[in-house]
Amino acid sequence: MDSELMHSIVGSYHKPPERVFVPSFTQNEPSQNCHPANLEVTSPKILHSPNSQALILALKTLQEKIHRLELERTQAEDNLNILSREAAQYKKALENETNERNLAHQELIKQKKDISIQLSSAQSRCTLLEKQLEYTKRMVLNVEREKNMILEQQAQLQREKEQDQMKLYAKLEKLDVLEKECFRLTTTQKTAEDKIKHLEEKLKEEEHQRKLFQDKASELQTGLEISKIIMSSVSNLKHSKEKKKSSKKTKCIKRRPPWQICSKFGALPFVAEKMRQHRDPHILQKPFNVTETRCLPKPSRTTSWCKAIPPDSEKSISICDNLSELLMAMQDELDQMSMEHQELLKQMKETESHSVCDDIECELECLLKKMEIKGEQISKLKKHQDSVCKLQQKVQNSKMSEASGIQQEDSYPKGSKNIKNSPRKCLTDTNLFQKNSSFHPIRVHNLQMKLRRDDIMWEQ
């Protein structure tokens, strides 16, 4: 389009036409443009001119060119408008792009700031987490230590429980042993009680026998009194005959040895040593050293009343023998118990275990109790024997008094004093006869009283 304008006659706004032939009437163009009505008026005049056709053509071309130029101008204006619009659009697009870039940059800056803030917060969190990790590690270590301490305490408690259980088992075993010992002691106590009952029954039987013996002794005394009466009646008849023989009999009595005097008064009583009963089994002795002295039979010169021992006295001697045998047996049992006591003491010294020592101590206590019971039984039996011996002595004394009364009546007719001869007196007489053949009756009486005072004393 620009090229067309450049080569056109009129030219363009940018560049004028290179070759434009300006006719002579170009000077009158403005007036024509200005006064178109005049052309129409004057047209018939111009038409008659020779250049009229050329002018008309030129005018037509000019009109066309003007029309074209106007079109071009409109087109150019349109283009300018379009360009301005496009420029505005471009500006708007640029502004939008710049705005978008700015927004994107701002967003990036914000994102960077946010990321930096997040990083700082993450770092702070990391430090906190590290601190928390250290704290948790410490807590875990403390918990492990506490756990170990608790486990150790539990193990110690378990050990203590086991020790307590062992102690309980030991105590239970001791209780079982004590129960067994208690059962054994109860059985021994029952056996001892049975033995005591048996011995009490025996003692009752012996007391019954003693009562029977006393009854027999009373019967014998009545018999002796009757015999005295009979003998007194017989002695009155034979008094005259025996007066002559009295002097000879007194001489024979003085010349006789002491064993014959003892035979005159029957058997001597039992003599016991003076001793103390100790509870200690080591010092225990045999309580009786029985020395029974039997006198020999009387020679033929003595009277007929003293020739033989009566059967009642033989029975009493047999009872005394039985009692002495029983005493000896009980003393043997006591000796055996003392031997057992010594053996247990040796075992106690040899052993080291406390349980065995406790058992031996219990056995020793039981033995001591048995020995005490046995000692009491022996003392009771001795008392019974003493009572039996006293009864026997009374019977013998009664018989001897009768015999001595008859002899004194025969030997001392002038009324000398009748001294009752007891078995103890018989013993003193024998001792005095051994020392000196001549003795006084007052001295004999003093010795008799002394012996009665120094009789057997059993300390309990």
UniProtKB/Swiss-Prot annotation:
Task: Tell me the Gene3D superfamilies matching this sequence.
Answer: 1.20.58.90
Tell me the segments the record calls region Disordered: 399-423
Question: What is its subcellular localisation?
Answer: Cytoplasm, Cytoskeleton, Microtubule organizing center, Centrosome
Query: Which family would the database say this protein is a member of?
Result: Belongs to the translokin family.
UniProt key word Cytoplasm: yes
Residue ranges of coiled coil: 51-228, 317-384
Q: Does the keyword Transmembrane helix apply?
A: no
What does the UniProt record say this protein does?
Centrosomal protein which may be required for microtubule attachment to centrosomes.
User: What InterPro entries does the record point to?
Assistant: Centrosomal_MT-associated, Cep57_CLD, Cep57_MT-bd_dom
Task: Mark out the compositionally biased spans (Polar residues).
Answer: 399-410
Q: Name one GO cellular component term.
A: centrosome
Organism name: Homo sapiens (Human)
Top-rank taxon of the source lineage equals Eukaryota
- Give the Phosphoserine positions (modified residues): S49
Keyword tags: Coiled coil, Cytoplasm, Cytoskeleton, Microtubule, Phosphoprotein
Citing just one GO molecular function, the answer is: identical protein binding
**What name has this protein been given in UniProt?**
Centrosomal protein CEP57L1
